């Protein structure tokens, strides 16, 4: 819902500023690039307006929806929360993605254990995730490695934000423990309980 509102606001802004907002299959590469550049410009402007208006829940919903790359909404929003010491908003923004990646990893670990009775942790650690993702083959171990890397990247980014915002030491320790359990693949579903914060 918030994504639709955001997109409509961007389109309205583009129209008001005489910028291209609709394309066709017959557009030249130059026309397509101009439209996409205009869309990014409009997205940044609406993001700025919504941050000024403190429309945080809607922006967090847009970030959670996955329609935009993290650099468009997620990262500028997280940086705003850090700069303005909005710890609860930062938690709500970041925890969901970490939890979802870890849950995806846990579900795939469960499938692997059901199928093979064991989990080859060293093989998972040795998988070159970018090569696996760009390839066409599928394996439970490759998927576990992919979700593990995604969760670790998200946790490391979040820990950096938490250090900047001077988050409570106890909470930082919980994040560090989660990072270790994801890294060594000892994570359990119950380890994610502290990461279900909502505004």
Model-derived features: where do they sit?
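Acidic, low-complexity, intrinsically disordered interaction modules
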Residues: 63-67, 71-73, 97, 130-154
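Generic helix N-cap/helix-start motif at coil->alpha-helix transitions
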Residues: 29, 40, 67-75, 101-104, ...
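Non-Sec secretion/translocation targeting segments of pathogen effectors
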Residues: 197-199
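Alpha-helical solenoid scaffolds that mediate protein-protein interactions
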Residues: 66, 97-98, 162, 182
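Charged, low-complexity interaction regions
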Residues: 19-26, 161-171
């Amino acid at each position: 819902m918030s994504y639709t509102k955001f997109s409509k606001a961007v389109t309205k802004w583009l129209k008001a500023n005489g910028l291209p907002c609709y394309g066709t299959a017959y557009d030249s590469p130059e026309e397509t690039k101009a439209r996409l550049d205009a869309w990014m410009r409009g997205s940044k402007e609406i993001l700025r307006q919504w941050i000024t208006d403190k429309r945080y829940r809607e922006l967090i919903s847009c970030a959670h929806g996955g329609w935009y790359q993290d650099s468009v909404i997620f990262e500028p929003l997280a940086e705003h929360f850090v700069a303005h010491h909005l710890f609860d908003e930062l938690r709500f923004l970041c925890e969901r993605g970490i939890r979802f990646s870890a849950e995806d990893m846990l579900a795939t670990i469960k499938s692997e254990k059901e199928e093979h009775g064991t989990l080859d942790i060293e093989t998972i650690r040795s998988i070159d995730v970018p090569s696996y993702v760009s390839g066409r083959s599928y394996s439970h171990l490759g998927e576990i490695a992919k979700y593990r890397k995604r969760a670790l990247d998200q946790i490391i980014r979040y820990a950096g934000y938490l250090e900047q915002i001077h988050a409570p030491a106890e909470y930082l320790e919980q994040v560090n423990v989660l990072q270790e359990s994801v890294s060594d693949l000892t994570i359990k579903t119950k380890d994610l309980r502290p990461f279900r914060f909502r505004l």
